Amino acid sequence: MYSILNPLFSHAPSFIKTTRRPKPPLLSSISLHSRSSGEEAKPILLLLPPIWTATEIAQAVNGRIVQCGPPGTISTDTRTLVPNQWFFAISGETFDAHDFITPKLSEKGCIGVIGNRVSENWNKGFVSTDGDSLVSLMRMGSYARSRFSGEVVGVTGSTGKTTTKSMIALALGGCEKKVYENFGNWNNEIGVALSLIGIPGNAGLVVLEMGMDSKGEILELARMARPSVRVILNVGNSHLVNFGSLEEIAMAKGEILVEAKPGDVCVLNADDPLVMSLPLPCGVKKVLFGRNTGCDVRLVVAESTDGGRAVQVVLEKNGKRVKFRIPSPGLHLALNACAAAAVATHLGVPLTQVGHSLSTFCPVHMRSELQVAKNGITIVNDAYNANPTSTKAAINLLNDIECRGKRVAILGDMLELGSNEIKFHEMILEHCCNAHIDLIGLVGTRLLTAAKNLNLVEHKNVVVAHDAKTLALEILKWIDPDDVVLVKGSRGMEMETVVNALKETEIQSGN
């Protein structure tokens, strides 16, 4: 049994400049959950998120109270705002949320506004902020962090952040303190700030993931969250469009370490030379995870089992081993579990308890998520995002799954890879051809160019399209009920369109 708190009190605004965030449930409360292997999470206790007074809000954003309002929780989305919430108006690249401050907002139960301005007929609470609204939100996040005295775990890396963050929270369920993790992959400035603002008063441990598109972003997130445990999972070729090399990406990820204080813990992947090359501040404690014999927590065994639908893992710490089964496909999950064990055991959870907790792990939505449609198709829904490393791992996952029908890889473009993007797409297609893949579906200009370069466009086992909707219609002509279908692509390719079509369409045998 474990306890995890999620910030279900608001949505990230729709104009976040990075990737789209999944929508949290329409709740103004936080649930603790108990889960056993193979079961859905069951709520056992309902807790309210932290309540903010107008005075606290004004102090947090360095603003002033123009009109006092009652205490309440915080929202950034007028569409999902519920009664007794303050609305934090953020100006984005596409929308200015101040434009939505109307009497209708009051009718929904909004008790106050935090922002630069309100309409003339606004008669509820108003805390005025000066300057950039995003800076004010981050200032409030930093203030919220200063009110929390427990441990904060910050996780970054090129791949596996969300999955590992969830595994860490799950593994920490073996300790006595209540664990709070950021919702989904709220890993940019807005998401991390909202997660900090939502820390419940009775939480003892916080787990946050931190993402970036460019240099300096991780440093800002780390300054706001001030993690006492700082985790770097890996360095890969995502976001190469904004960097000149993998070494530059490594330095950007390494910003999470820069301002670590003496006594802070840095949890590092010993198998990644770029991670290990990063300088550490004086006085920090280094905890290593990986396959190398010198690791504090070592991955001894990672084997595909249950016909490729689960992973058998053996971890070792101080000569003691634990063996457990992760009920989800993908050998890459073993190293994620190793990282989670490194964090949890350092914070006092016994290794055996970590193994027991991780044996109940359920994959994050649209990340190696195994789904069986009513029409008989087995879908590996890995549609949330993609880079060369994660796409290769997904193809390997598909290759490992036992299948009575065809193995089908439906791939969308991998974005933000810079000047060598076509070469990366060619490498992925070559990997598909060398694996036991029976049918390949491709969508996007980059994959189409790569397929042309490799003379694959006219191949009978390759289906191409310029958008996901068209590809879904075409690929369904070739799919049979017993097929296993991987769907993978960058967020901007909207590959969930294909997933939904696979789920909803009746399939006739003999395609």
Residue ranges of model-derived segments:
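Short acidic-hydrophobic, aromatic-tinged amphipathic segments that line or gate anion-handling sites
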Residues: 126-132, 461-471
